[in-house]
Design a protein with these regions (language model features):
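Cleavable N-terminal signal peptides of Sec/SRP-targeted secreted and luminal proteins
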Residues: 2-17
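Flexible, active-site-proximal loop/turn residues at the rims of small-molecule/cofactor binding pockets
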Residues: 10, 52, 202
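Substrate-binding cleft of extracellular glycoside hydrolase catalytic domains
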Residues: 19-144
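Functionally critical loop-and-helix segments that line ligand-binding/catalytic clefts
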Residues: 19-28, 163-216
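Surface-exposed, flexible loop/turn segments at secondary-structure boundaries
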Residues: 54, 84-86, 154-156, 180, ...
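Conserved beta-strand termini and adjacent loop/short-helix elements that scaffold enzyme active sites
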Residues: 81, 149-151, 199
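Catalytic domains of cell-wall/extracellular-matrix polysaccharide-remodeling enzymes
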Residues: 110-187
């Protein structure tokens, strides 16, 4: 019986490792050749920046998305870092502009991840909640599959740890730089469940590219 259980554990471990997929996100220009180089090192998905926190599209990030597709990545997504100060356009307008720029460039993405982290957000949580809901509403209206990038600490400061506004139906991209490909240290917030983990960041990766490391 013990031997049988041991065999099951070994099989489960093999299956778990086989189903583990590693990818990356990065900013700055990355050529198709370099994308292929990174892919050959075992990275299977890429998430490129579509929108910058200063309130404009990321032309290099959108080009990276196209280059990742050309390089044959299994999944290619985009992330949206919103502009949140009083000088910024509305959430709706920002998403519309990002959509326009992606279409103009002919760039296709799987999921558009809304980057909700502490950077120039107002202290008014009610206002922040409305802004987040408007981001998601407009993105879904335009046909995007939407996800959320955040952690307990980021979400708590911006919108409140217990709030989700119905957004916990969306996949969560969770940052936690413990260098472990595991969800075991996830601190729950808003009823979300992690789908992807950013397990390390701002490191020198393969092929001379500075990147964040991701896993699911």
């Amino acid at each position: 019986m013990k031997f049988f259980l041991l065999i099951l554990l070994v099989i489960f471990s093999i299956f778990e490792n086989a189903s583990s997929i590693t990818g990356f996100d990065a900013i700055g220009s990355i050529s198709t050749t370099t994308m292929k180089c990174i892919k050959e090192k075992g990275y299977e998905f890429f998430i490129g920046r579509v929108w910058r926190s200063m309130g404009s599209h990321d032309a290099a990030g959108i080009e990276n998305i196209k280059n990742a597709v050309k390089a044959g990545y299994k999944h290619v997504d985009g992330y949206f870092f919103p502009c949140t100060t009083s000088r910024c356009s509305s959430a709706k307008t920002q998403v519309e502009e990002a959509h326009k720029e992606l279409n103009k460039a002919g760039a296709k993405i799987g999921t558009l991840w809304m980057d909700i982290e502490r950077y120039e957000w107002p202290s008014d949580k009610a206002k922040n909640r409305r802004f987040i809901l408007e981001l998601v509403k407009e993105a879904e209206k335009l046909g995007f599959k939407v996800g959320i990038y955040s952690s307990y600490y980021e979400w708590d400061v911006i919108a409140g740890a217990d709030w989700n506004g119905g957004l916990n139906r969306l996949p969560l991209w969770w940052p936690d730089y413990d260098n472990e490909k595991s969800f075991k240290n996830f601190k729950p917030f808003g009823g979300f469940k992690p789908s992807i983990k950013q397990y390390n960041g701002d490191k020198n990766g393969p092929c001379g590219v500075n990147m964040d490391f991701n896993w699911y």
